Amino acid sequence: MAESNFVDYVKIYCRSGKGGRGSTHMRREKYTPNGGPDGGDGGRGGHVILRGNRNYWTLLHLRYDRHAMAGHGESGSKNRSFGKDGADKIIEVPCGTVVYNAETGEYVCDVTEHGQEVILLKGGRGGLGNWHFKTATRQAPRFAQPGEPMQEMTVILELKLLADVGLVGFPNAGKSTLLSAISAAKPKIADYPFTTLEPNLGIVSYRDGQSFVMADIPGIIEGASEGKGLGLRFLRHIERNSLLLFMIPADSDDIRKDYEVLLNELKTFNPEMLDKQRVLAITKSDMLDQELMDEIEPTLPEGIPHVFISSVSGLGISVLKDILWTELNKESNKIEAIVHRPKDVSRLQQELKDMGEDEELDYEYEDDGDGDEDDLDYEYEEEDWEDK
């Protein structure tokens, strides 16, 4: 299979910068032989920062840039001169990116807004220069603080697409056809199952310049939540959707049963998915006359809005848009904060292996060569840092 440009999982090694050493310099001038300490503070190590960017919609740009390392802070110097702060490392990610610790599976953070910045790893604070430690009884301290050490972590970045409506259905249910009919998206469409191999997004225009975003994911089959088919990998892309549009073709042997199978797969994957608003669309309904529609109506699932549609003939499309817009704007449909559960590490590693993302990313770095002038052991307490 050709390598896809849609990358929603990537493993990267991150390392912040260590703080620069404080200086132990003693002031020495022609007419000031005993000038005392004037060593400056070390610079702060650079942070590793995630920044949301709506111009990205996959993690492809990170697949070949697996090491994110911030700069180290420089050492302080004479005349109480501060060392230069290390350069921050900013990682641009698409909105909807979730971060997990690759070793423990624990949730770390997520980025959902354009321009949102999250400090993933903090750089070490710079060490205090010796002038901070001058006292009445200690006029010439010949020690300074070392900078705080760097932090490092290997993380998994997982993309969960941000959309208002998520399309849910079996393969070949007409999801991609609907998306292409009501938006400018051009997903691959063919008369065989599993045509859609990766998620697609489309912006659906409504009235008065209003619009909403629709996401199409590969078809779900029974057992998808256990890893069958393509469903498991892509089910997470509808976790953030406000509303789920279930699509079942009119020629189904049992529409209610198919709906319950789909619902059960979502429940098994994440029980919270059942809290989302749902709409049912019976697709390919241009093959039905009104009499057949009337016969099918009583057999449909109860308690959710439904509509007969045909993406080819346009039957019911405007009604579907009205229903979706109404449901999206209900007060009960506002998404609450998503609870990100820890990942099963063994399952996570297997997914990474399947996608070729399981390579070791430990990075051997060289010493920054700050010199040995200030390389003195100093046991300091936390209060040494305060109010400095």
Curated annotation (Swiss-Prot):
Top-level enzyme category: hydrolase
Stretches with biased composition (Acidic residues): 356-388
Record has Magnesium as a keyword: yes
Protein localization: Cytoplasm
Binding site for Mg(2+): S176, T196
Ranges of residues in domain Obg: 4-162
Region called Disordered, residue ranges: 18-45, 352-388
GO CC annotations on file: cytoplasm
Highest taxon of the lineage: Bacteria
One of the GO biological process terms: ribosome biogenesis
Biased composition (Gly residues): 36-45
A GO molecular-function annotation: GTPase activity
Protein EC: 3.6.5.-
Cofactor: Mg(2+)
Domain OBG-type G intervals: 163-329
Keywords, ordered alphabetically: Cytoplasm, GTP-binding, Hydrolase, Magnesium, Metal-binding, Nucleotide-binding
InterPro entries documented for this protein: G_OBG, GTP-bd, GTP-bd_Obg/CgtA, GTP1-OBG_CS, GTP1_OBG_dom, GTP1_OBG_dom_sf, OBG_GTPase, P-loop_NTPase
Residues involved in GTP binding: 169-176, 194-198, 216-219, 283-286, 310-312
Family assignment from sequence similarity: Belongs to the TRAFAC class OBG-HflX-like GTPase superfamily. OBG GTPase family.
Subunit annotation: Monomer.
Biological role: An essential GTPase which binds GTP, GDP and possibly (p)ppGpp with moderate affinity, with high nucleotide exchange rates and a fairly low GTP hydrolysis rate. Plays a role in control of the cell cycle, stress response, ribosome biogenesis and in those bacteria that undergo differentiation, in morphogenesis control.
PANTHER family per UniProt: DEVELOPMENTALLY REGULATED GTP-BINDING PROTEIN-RELATED, MITOCHONDRIAL RIBOSOME-ASSOCIATED GTPASE 2
Name by which UniProt lists this protein: GTPase Obg
Naturally occurring in which organism (per UniProt): Bacteroides fragilis (strain ATCC 25285 / DSM 2151 / CCUG 4856 / JCM 11019 / LMG 10263 / NCTC 9343 / Onslow / VPI 2553 / EN-2)
